[in-house]
Amino acid sequence: MKKKWTLEETKMLFKKPFFNLMFQAQEEHRKNFDPNTIQISTLLSIKTGSCPEDCKYCPQSSRYKTGLKKEPLLEIEQILSAAKKAKDSGSSRFCMGAAWKNPKEKDMPYLEKIIKKIKEMGMETCMTLGTLNSTQAKKLADAGLDFYNHNLDTSKNFYSNIITTRTYQERLHTLHAVRSSGMKVCSGGIIGLGEKKQDRIELLIELSNLSIQPESVPINMLVKIPGTPMADNKDVEPFDFIRIIAVARIMMPKSYIRLSAGRHKMNDQTQAMCFMAGANSIFYGCKLLTSDNPEEKHDLELFKKLDLIPENKTQTLLKEDEYKTIIKSSKIKKDQYYNAAII
C-alpha cells in the first residue's frame, strides 16, 4: 500500500539535521537506483513564444516584453536532426515543448508523427504542450509517447500568485488524463517564486500523494528573466535547494529526481551535493530557452570527476575518446533549447 505523506511528517523531514537528512536520502536512493548512474534528457522547443498564459516566471508569455524571438512549429526534419544529435551526445530521452495553453486538434496528427519518428530512433520521448483532455492524451499515448511533462509549479495555496490563466485543478486533471492514458508522468515544481517553506512542503506532499507518484520529478531553481515579473526575485539559498532535493528523494524513492532549470547558477560542489541528495537526472543541452545551461563539455567533465555514468552507456567510465566523440557530436543550435518548467 502506497504511503500517504502527512504535513507533520514532511515538516519533520525539513527539520532534520542536514547530514542526517542527506544520509537518509542517500539510503533511499541506493535502495532503488545505482548511485553512480545518471539519466540524461535533452529538450527542444518545437514552438516558441506567444503563449496566452500569464505565468509570471515565463519569457514565453505574450504578456511580457523579454525580447524572446517567436518561432512557429518546427519542421519535422529540424526536430529529427536535433533528436539524432541529442542521442549522439548521450541523451536517452528527447523532450519537446510547445508554448501553448493546450494543443489544437489540427496539430495532433503532426505531433503523433513526430513521436513515431523519434521512437524509431530508439529514444524515449516526452512532450510538454500545456493542458490535455483525455482524448488528446490517449492519442499521444497510442503514438508511443513515453512521458508527458506538466508541472504543478508550487503549492495549491501559493499558485494564484504565480498564474491566473490556468487553475491548479486543471493541472491535476491533465496529470490524471496522462496517467489514465498509460503514459508516464513528469511533474515537479519551481523553487524561488517567492514561496515560503510551507509552500515547498505542500508541493512535495501534492506530488508524492498523487495516485501513482510521478516517474520523473524535475526540481527547478527559478531562472530570473528580465522583463518578467519575477526578474528581481531573491536568489535561492543553495543548501535550501539541496534540502528540497533530499526530501523529494525520501518522499518519492522510486522517482527520477531531475536537477533542472537554474543548474547554470550552481557550482560543481552544489551540483555534486544535489546528486548525493538523490538527484539522478539532468537536462543536457547548450541552452535552456533564454537562460544559460552548463555546456555539454563541462557536464561531461563533472560526470568524470564524480564517476557518474549516463544511464544508456556501459557501466564503466567512458574512455577519453568516447568523451571527445560525445563532445564533438553535441554542437546543436543553442537557441532551440528551453526549460520544461516554462509550461
Curated annotation (Swiss-Prot):
Q: Extract the GO molecular function terms from the UniProt entry.
A: 2 iron, 2 sulfur cluster binding; 4 iron, 4 sulfur cluster binding; biotin synthase activity; iron ion binding
| Domain Radical SAM core per the UniProt entry, residue ranges | 36-254
Can the keyword 4Fe-4S be found in this entry's annotation? Answer: yes
Mind telling me which SUPFAM superfamilies this protein's record contains? Radical SAM enzymes
Recorded hits in InterPro entries, A to Z, give: Aldolase_TIM, BATS_dom, Biotin_synth/BioAB, Biotin_synthase, Elp3/MiaA/NifB-like_rSAM, rSAM
Q: In which pathway does it act?
A: Cofactor biosynthesis; biotin biosynthesis; biotin from 7,8-diaminononanoate: step 2/2
Q: Where does [2Fe-2S] cluster bind?
A: 95, 126, 186, 258
**One Pfam assignment:** Radical_SAM
Note accompanying the cofactor annotation = Binds 1 [4Fe-4S] cluster. The cluster is coordinated with 3 cysteines and an exchangeable S-adenosyl-L-methionine. Binds 1 [2Fe-2S] cluster. The cluster is coordinated with 3 cysteines and 1 arginine.
Any idea which positions bind [4Fe-4S] cluster? 51, 55, 58
Q: Which GO terms describe its biological process?
A: biotin biosynthetic process
Q: Which Gene3D superfamilies match?
A: Aldolase class I
Q: Which PANTHER family match?
A: BIOTIN SYNTHASE, BIOTIN SYNTHASE, MITOCHONDRIAL
As for family, the record states: Belongs to the radical SAM superfamily. Biotin synthase family.
Name this polypeptide is given:
Biotin synthase
Source organism per entry reads: Buchnera aphidicola subsp. Acyrthosiphon pisum (strain 5A)
